[in-house]
Amino acid sequence: MILVIDVGNTNIVLGVYDEQTLLQHWRIATDRTRTTDEYGMLVKALFRDAELNVEDIEGIVLSSVVPPVVFPLENMCVRYFNRRPFVIGPGIKTGLDLKVDNPREVGADRIVNAVAATVKYDGPLIIVDFGTATTYCYIDAQKRYYGGIISPGVMVSTEALYNKAAKLPRIEIAKPQSTIGRNTVHAMQSGTYFGYVAQVDGLVHRMKEEMGEATVIATGGLARLISEESATIKIVDPFLTLDGLRIIYERNK
C-alpha cells in the first residue's frame, strides 16, 4: 500500500492506495504551526480509526504548494512510517511536455492533476480545480501542457467580501433557488454561486476559442456543486489529484 499526501493552502488531503484502489481518504486543515509529532499523532489516529496499519505502507508520495509544511511532513513520514517520502518537484518523470515560459513555476498540484487526467481521459483536456485558488489548465491530445488561468477561489472571494464590507455577513456557499436574491444572504449566495458558474463557463469558452475543443474536467471541493449549473463541465473527478500522485509515484519508483 502507498500513502499519498496533497498539501493545499487550506486543506491537506491524504489517501491510501492498494495498487490502483483507493482504500481510504481524509481531509485535514493545513496548519503551518503543527509539528512533526502533531502531524504524526493525527495521521496515526486516522489510520487507527480506519483499521489500517502504518506498517503496511510501502511508499509515500507528497505534493505541496505550502513550503513550510513540507519539512514537518517529511519528518513525520520518516518517524512514524519509517519511509522517506517521494516529494513532487522539478525533474520528476511526468510524461508531460510543458509548453510554458518557466516550467519550475507550475504548481505541483496542477502538474499532478494533469498527469492523472491524461492517463484517465482522452485529450484535449481542460482541468478546473476549485481550491484556495481556482485554476484552469489546458493539455492537448499529445500531453502537451500549455498553461492556463489562476483566479481567486470561491472561499477566498467570499471571505474578502465579509472582511472588507462592514455590513455584509459571512455566508455558506450554496446554490440558491433563484438568481435574484430577496435578502442579503440570498443575494450574496447568488452572486457567489452563479458568478462562479459564469466565470467557469466564460473562461472555458475563451480557452476553447484559443486552443480548440476539449473535455472539461472539474475537481476540488466545490466541483460537484458548481457543475450542477455549468454548461461546460462534463466530468467531475473528486480524486483526480490523489490518483495523479499515485501515478507519478509508480512512474518514478
Curated annotation (Swiss-Prot):
Substrate binds at G107, A108, D109, R110, T184. The keyword Cell cycle does not apply. CDD domains: ASKHA_NBD_PanK-III. Pathway: Cofactor biosynthesis; coenzyme A biosynthesis; CoA from (R)-pantothenate: step 1/5. It is found in: Cytoplasm. It catalyses: (R)-pantothenate + ATP = (R)-4'-phosphopantothenate + ADP + H(+). The keyword Cytoplasm applies. InterPro entries: ATPase_NBD (IPR043129), Type_III_PanK (IPR004619). Keywords: ATP-binding, Coenzyme A biosynthesis, Cytoplasm, Kinase, Metal-binding, Nucleotide-binding, Potassium, Transferase. Its cofactor is NH4(+); K(+). Its EC number is 2.7.1.33. A monovalent cation. Ammonium or potassium. GO terms for cellular component: cytoplasm. One of its GO terms (molecular function) is metal ion binding. Pfam families: Pan_kinase (PF03309). ATP binds at D6, V7, G8, N9, T10, N11, I12, V13, T132. Its main location: cytoplasm. GO terms for biological process: coenzyme A biosynthetic process. The active site is at D109. K(+) binds at D129. Belongs to the type III pantothenate kinase family. Homodimer. Catalyzes the phosphorylation of pantothenate (Pan), the first step in CoA biosynthesis. PANTHER family: TYPE III PANTOTHENATE KINASE. NCBIfam families: baf, PRK13318.1-1, PRK13318.1-5, PRK13318.1-6, PRK13321.1. This is Type III pantothenate kinase.
